[in-house]
């Protein structure tokens, strides 16, 4: 027993000590340890020490959930609460819900990914320069699907019902006899009722509307008229008709109204079921529909109904008429008229696509072709446009060295003269356009292939003699990883002799300038060709070229060698040039320097054509001449002037 200053403790303190100890023991034996329990036990011990009350805690404590009074009443179980995800901050998703007073909702079920709903308006932008004829068939096919979707969703539902008629019903109609008196008529009606207080005795269908009436905007309503005999039990009566059109999946209610009093004890009520008023509902349930390829579609409707008779004076009793537990059934046949058939959306889509014809089935769609001889307008660029292309496939789409040259020959007794037309290279203008004639196709330079293999030689092939001369300065490139700037464009004067099977052409290029003005503008080429006969099989030819280009790298492409073609006035070939630099230098030393512009003569010796670098020149003037020869069908080139600075 503890003492305090030699005195005994008060009984209240003893009790508090005992209770706090027992509560501590009970809390330690429990399975749950939480700061909430410790704080609660501590506060209870202090309060018990002052008041002397005993407090007992449960073995398991639960966290108290607090809800805002403005929140919607939602019951959340422990299992559902564990599946809720924290609503992360997103600018696209509002953090407050307006229907709960603007309070923040801490939890939300992530059902939709709102990031998928975001779109860019740029996706709907179209190129104004696109070709309309290319998308003609696509737009024509899509028009049919668009109209079908419009009819399915009812956004532009433009069809009506016509030509309806009553096919069958299971009603046993009442046959009246006008010769009998009122007493006899009443007896006959009660006999027809067969102990019932309500019974349908007549069903009729409204007058149908024909297709011609609808075309003249004379619309009608498809209605079912019914007459009911009612036993006059009380003055206050209520008769309700319950009907369905899809075997009681959907139920509709209408009221019958007083029509007349047949006898003092029998009244007649009348009801109307308007089928036309339920048109949208029938469309949504696919009970009536239209075929897009037909003017009208026949649909069958099966209507079932029964009646209820409520009487006020008989303790609100209700009487039913369900046709002896069989319900009343009516089968109606009607025609759904497609009003879109007159003015179809396809005529709007295909108004600019030429005449078209659409068959009775969606499998047959015939469209007239455009005139094959008519040329489509292509995109054109201005002549001074710079073309820079860094694409790996640039050699397939860029043809800056594609020129058209037409050979115009004039037969003369002593002098033969041929002059090529002035041509300017306009990329993409003739990329898709076929040649006008066979002559243009022959003279137009086709493929221009230039590839570098191990930086030792070039493979150069062309189908035009003039183009090879114009671009001969490209052959200077070898072992130049990066072109260095030069002071002025080099002037190259070339003289060569071409040996072929049938004749030899000797030509001398007099003024070949590679003008690169202002960072190598787009390529332009001007060509003049003059030939004069020297001997029977030899002609003297002179070319004058002026060209500049900035896209030499776009013409580099590794390609196999092409065989040398037979020479002609319209189609010539240049053989593949392969040489090693060391052989060039050795041949250059052995051959020696000669005077420029020697006399042109055919060469029959066969030697490898050297490569012409500008770095191996030691003369101060920078001029020398190389005399080389090839076997027949190959080129012999004499090069006269070179500058040390490489040409790009």
From Swiss-Prot:
Disulfide bonds: none annotated. One of its GO terms (cellular component) is protein phosphatase type 1 complex. Residues 20-51 have a biased composition (Low complexity). Residues 593-609 have a biased composition (Polar residues). Residues 20-52, 593-629 are annotated as: Disordered. The keyword Iron does not apply. It holds the Pfam family CBM_21. Keywords: Glycogen biosynthesis. GO terms for molecular function: glycogen binding; protein phosphatase 1 binding; protein phosphatase regulator activity. GO terms for biological process: glycogen biosynthetic process; regulation of glycogen biosynthetic process. Residues 201-331 form the CBM21 domain. The keyword Methyltransferase does not apply. It comes from the Eukaryota. InterPro entries: CBM21_dom (IPR005036), CBM21_dom_sf (IPR038175), PP1_regulatory_subunit_3 (IPR050782). Regulates the activity of glycogen synthase. It is most probably a regulatory subunit for protein phosphatase type 1. This is Serine/threonine-protein phosphatase 1 regulatory subunit PIG1.
């Amino acid at each position: 027993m503890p003492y305090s200053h030699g005195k005994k403790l008060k009984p209240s303190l003893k009790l508090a000590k005992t209770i706090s100890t027992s509560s501590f023991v009970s809390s330690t034996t429990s399975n749950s340890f939480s700061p909430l329990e410790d704080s609660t036990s501590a506060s209870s011990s202090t309060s018990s020490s002052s008041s002397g009350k005993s407090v007992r805690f449960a073995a398991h404590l639960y966290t108290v959930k607090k809800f805002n009074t403005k929140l919607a009443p939602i019951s959340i179980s422990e299992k559902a609460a564990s599946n809720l995800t924290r609503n992360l901050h997103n600018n696209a998703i509002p953090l407050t819900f307006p229907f709960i007073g603007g309070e923040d909702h801490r939890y939300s079920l992530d059902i939709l990914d709102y990031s998928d709903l975001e779109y860019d308006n740029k996706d709907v932008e179209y190129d104004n320069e696109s070709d309309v004829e290319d998308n003609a068939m696509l737009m024509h096919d899509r028009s049919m699907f668009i109209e079908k979707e419009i009819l399915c969703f009812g956004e532009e539902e433009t069809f009506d019902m016509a030509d309806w008629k009553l096919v069958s019903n299971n009603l046993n109609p009442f046959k009246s006899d006008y010769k009998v008196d009122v007493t006899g008529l009443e007896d006959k009606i009660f006999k027809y009722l067969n102990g019932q207080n309500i019974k349908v005795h007549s069903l009729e269908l409204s007058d149908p509307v024909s297709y011609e009436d609808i075309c003249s905007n004379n619309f009608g309503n498809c209605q079912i008229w019914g007459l009911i005999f009612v036993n006059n039990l009380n003055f206050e009566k209520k008769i309700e008709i319950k009907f369905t059109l899809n075997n009681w999946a959907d139920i509709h209610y209408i009221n019958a109204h007083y029509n007349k009093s047949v006898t003092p004890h029998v009244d007649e009520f009348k009801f109307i079921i308007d089928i036309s008023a339920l048109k949208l509902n029938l469309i949504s349930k696919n009970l009536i529909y239209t075929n897009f390829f037909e003017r009208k579609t026949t649909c069958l409707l099966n209507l079932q109904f029964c009646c209820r008779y409520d009487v006020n004076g008989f303790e609100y009793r209700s009487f039913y008429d369900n046709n002896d537990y069989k319900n009343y059934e009516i089968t109606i046949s009607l025609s759904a008229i497609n009003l879109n058939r007159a003015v179809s959306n396809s005529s709007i889509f295909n108004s600019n696509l030429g005449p078209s014809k659409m068959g009775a089935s969606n499998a047959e769609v015939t469209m007239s072709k455009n005139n094959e001889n008519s040329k489509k307008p292509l995109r054109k660029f201005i002549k001074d446009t710079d073309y820079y292309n860094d694409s790996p496939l640039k050699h397939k789409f860029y043809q800056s060295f594609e020129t058209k040259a037409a050979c115009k020959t004039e037969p003369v007794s002593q002098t033969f003269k041929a002059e090529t037309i002035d041509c300017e290279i306009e990329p993409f203008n003739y990329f898709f356009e076929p040649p006008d004639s066979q002559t243009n196709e022959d003279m137009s330079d086709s493929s221009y292939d230039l590839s570098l293999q191990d930086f030792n030689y070039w493979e150069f092939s062309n189908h035009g003699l003039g183009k090879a001369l114009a671009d001969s300065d490209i052959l200077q490139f070898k072992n130049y990883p990066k072109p260095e700037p030069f002071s002025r464009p080099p002037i190259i004067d070339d003289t060569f002799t071409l040996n072929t099977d049938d004749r030899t052409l000797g030509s001398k290029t007099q003024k070949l300038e590679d003008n690169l003005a202002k960072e190598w503008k787009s390529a332009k080429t001007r060509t003049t060709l003059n030939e004069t006969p020297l001997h029977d099989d030899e002609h003297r030819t002179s070319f004058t070229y002026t060209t500049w280009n900035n896209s030499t790298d776009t013409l580099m492409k590794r390609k196999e060698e092409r065989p040398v073609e037979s020479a002609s006035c319209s189609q010539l070939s240049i053989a593949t040039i392969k040489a090693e630099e060391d052989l060039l230098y050795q041949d250059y030393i052995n051959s020696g320097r000669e005077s420029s512009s020697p006399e042109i003569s055919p060469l029959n010796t066969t030697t490898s054509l050297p490569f012409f670098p500008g770095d191996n020149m030691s003369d101060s003037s920078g001029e020398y001449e190389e005399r080389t020869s090839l076997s027949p069908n190959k080129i012999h080139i004499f090069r006269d002037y070179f500058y040390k600075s490489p040409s790009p």
